[in-house]
Each structure stands twice: as C-alpha cells, then as structure tokens.
Amino acid sequence: MNVHVAGSRTRGLIGATTGFFVGFAAVSLFGPVAHRFQEVMGLTPVMVAFLVATPSLTGSLLRIPFGAWVDTTGGRKPFLVLLSLSLLGMVGVWALIVALYPDHLVVSFYPLLLFLAALSGCGIATFSVGIGQVAYWYPPERHGSSLGAYAGLGNIAPGLFAFLLPITLTAWGLAGSYLAWIILLGAGIAAYWLTGLNAPFFQLRRAGVPEDEARRRAEELGQKVFPSAGIRASLGIAARRSATWSLVGIYFTTFGGFIALTAWFPTYWMSYFGLSIGTAGTLTAIYSVGASVIRVPGGSLADRLGGEATAVGSLVVTLVGALLLTSSPTFALSVTGAVLMAIGMGICNAAVFKLVPQVAKEAVGGVAGWVGGLGAFGGFAIPPIMGAFVSARGQAGYPLGFVVFVALAVFSIVLAWLLHRRLAARTA
C-alpha cells in the first residue's frame, strides 16, 4: 500500500508547541484580574483562590485519559477536542462578562463562573497530549531537548498573558480583553489544524496500513518509539511502575507548583506588597516566563547529566527559593526567592520528562498522562491552601503560605533519590 507520510520532526514539534501554547494560557485566566471579580462579587480569599485555580482542575485531571489516548491516535484528535472545549468555555466567560459585569455579576453566579473556568481549563490538558505526540516523533536520545523545547516554549503563555492582560484591560476593558483572547485561541486552533501532524506510524495506521508494515515503514523513516497498548493498558502499564509515582510526586511540586504560583502570584504581589496590577503582572511574568524558558536548556542539561541528578540539583534550588519567600518580609528577598523557584522548577520540569520515556517506553502516553495529570493537580490543590493561610493569619499568611513549597521540595528530593535507586537497579 503506497501511503504518503506528511510532515517532519520539526513540523510535529512546532504544531504541538503551538497548540499547547494557546491552550495552556488558561492558567492565567483569572489570576491577573481576580481582584476585579473579588470586588464586584464580594469573594473571600479562599473563593478567589478556588477561582484562579479551577482551570487547573480540569487541565490536570483530563491529562490522564487524554495523554493515554495518544498511544492509540498519535495526538491530533485529542488536541483538537481539548482546544475546542477550551474555546467554548472562554466564549462563555466572555458572554457572562458582557451580560452582567460589573453591576449584576453577584456572588450567586460564582458556581457558573467556576464551571466556565473548568471548561476553559481543558486546553491546559493538552500538555500530556503534546508530550506523547512529540515523544513519538523524536528518538529517545533527543527527548530531553525536544520535550524541553516543547514544554518550555509552550509554558511561556501564562506568564505572557499575565503581563499582557493588565495592559489590555486599560485599553479594551475586561470584555474586550477576553474577546481578544478568544480570537487568539481560535487562531491557534487553526494553526494546530494545519501543522499538528502525528508521527509516521499513526499516519500509516490511520491510512489502513497493517500494524507490522506500518511499524517497519515508520522505522525506515526514523521513528524509534512505538505504542504497544491501548488506553487502559497504557495507563495500567504505567501505574504498575513505581517510578511513575515518584515522578508524579516530583511533578506535583514543580509543575503543579508552577501553575499554582502563576495563578497566585498576582494576588500575592498586589495584596501583600500593595503593588499595581501592571507591576504584579510583570513580576508574575518574570517568574512564569523564566521558569518556562529555562526549561529548554534544562532539557539539554538532563540529556547530559541524567534526569535524576538534574532533578535533585534543581529541587535544592527550589527549596532555597521557597525558604526565602517563607521567611522574608522584604520585597527584594521575595523577588529573589521567586526567581530561584522559577529556575529550580523549570529545570526540574524538564528533567522529569527526560525520565518519562525511560519508565515505560511501550506506554509513554500512559506515563505522561499520570505524571502530567496528577502532577499538574498541584495547580488546583495548592492555591486554596495558600488562601487558607491568608484567611487564618491575615497579611502574615501570604509569606507563611510558602511553607507548603518548603515541605514539597524536601519530599521531592527524597523521591528523586529513590527514583535514582530504582532506575539504577533496573539497568544493573
């Protein structure tokens, strides 16, 4: 059967990164403007924390089944489904603002706002889909750099939007800002439709080529990683590997924490230090974009030093940053702590996904689903805990809340050490 295989590794990487970029921006859906909803709706600190974190709930949990779905389809279909759901949620948020904001947007609409936030967060779940899609395009020895580029560039979106949203608020207002976001998301979906291609094996299978022949021809085209199981089997294989759960714990700290802080930092900077929304957005962007960009060289570092060693070193940096934020009452030291956390979290995130294909080569999507899904759940779980510190201790609760990251960093260092022992024993 003569079937043409379209695309290339580079095109596959560009397509996946584009789709992830526009979907992942929903991490900053409410963070930069949460104070506006708090004022008009009369929300408590904990309610604000749940609002900014809710997109990450669906964005994390949906990564599990959709990440595993990649092992049967190659990623294109899951990507388009998630991005379309996110677009629907964004349109709903915009319509609610146009119809009710500010005078009629009362607290009784809070559940509806949470639902639309959850729907908008579906785009965040594209992360594990893209991880699998890119991993099937590239050979294992280039997974650190390719996945680092994918995740690092895609992760820039929340920080960029946290910086731009306060600017567009001044120019276009709240409704105009969200409308511009919707247009950008729609353009991103169209761009992914044109560029987001599956790896050769999946293209051949979709064209009706028998599995053995599709595998042989894909190998001739340079593909080295192949699925060997369906969705349930892929998740099952991954779940039976203890190393999967070590990566989940580490990723909960570094990537879940990254999402949590990207959503929480605008509130922290404005409420604790009294900064303007523009300055708070800029500082949040420095953290978020910094953690994202450093993920690219972090992937190359993991290729050279190994994922486990890179994870341990970067987690120590994260711990130091968290200690500074917990104990510092000064602005300068708090900024230093945030920068150190950005460096540590960004590099560790790259190290984790250098290790994902090593855990189960035959079920990359399953491992990526568990790690990306449950790990990213930290983005939903952590902000309400930090909000509870504020509710209990007032202003002093803002720095005290970072003790959560101190504990998580220590726990993750232990997990990384145990992971090193498990993988070393397997290869011995």
Task: Please report, for each region that a protein language model flagged, where it lies by residue.
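C-terminal transmembrane helical hairpin of 12-TM major facilitator-type secondary transporters
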Residues: 302-352
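A membrane-interface helix-boundary motif in multi-pass transporters
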Residues: 170-183, 388-408
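Juxtamembrane intracellular "pre-TM" segments in multi-pass secondary transporters
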Residues: 1-7, 203-246
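Cytoplasmic helix-loop-helix junction between adjacent transmembrane helices
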Residues: 116-153
